[in-house]
A protein has these predicted regions:
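C-terminal alpha-helical interaction appendages
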Residues: 1-95, 108, 115-139
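N-terminal leader/targeting and assembly helices and adjacent pre-domain segments
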Residues: 98-99
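Small/polar glycine-rich anion-binding or flexible loop at a beta-alpha turn
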Residues: 102-106
Length: 139
């Protein structure tokens, strides 16, 4: 089980992903840009000032860093929140970097798995996503 601060950061990242839709960012491109960004790498660190920044500040920093694309396909809020939450939880659960997590579970996969996995515990959903990646890697 994660600690309170870690769960708060999972919630913050879920809200950040929701905010990206409100700001009209293409969801797939936004998620890819974020997960591969220096901003996400900073949040991965044990202690970093970005962990205390709000969603709006993080979004503006990411906009300066990677300039995600506006318009395009925008996912629903529930899928975005779940994806953001699970990606951050995954980092705390396994210690993997955001960049490595995204390689295993890109935005399209998270969107397609949302309906099946969103009612599972975060650990179970992550384990299944990792299993799927390893199976795909074998073939």
């Amino acid at each position: 089980m994660l600690e309170s601060l870690e769960l708060t950061l999972c919630d913050m990242q879920g809200k950040l992903f929701e905010l990206s839709a409100k700001e009209n960012f293409d969801s797939e491109k936004f998620i890819k840009a974020f997960m591969n960004s220096e901003t996400a790498a900073d949040i991965d660190k044990p202690f970093n000032h970005m962990q205390w920044a709000g969603e709006s500040y993080i979004l503006s920093r990411l906009d300066e860093e990677n300039t995600p694309v506006k318009g395009g396909c925008i996912y629903d809020d529930e899928t975005l929140y779940w994806s953001g939450y699970i990606y951050r939880y995954w980092h705390y659960y396994t210690g993997e970097s955001s960049k490595n997590i995204y390689k295993q579970a890109p935005a399209k996969l998270m969107r397609s798995m949302y309906l099946m996995y969103h009612t599972m515990s975060p650990e179970m959903a992550i384990d299944r996503l990792k299993e799927s990646f390893l199976e795909k890697k074998k073939s």
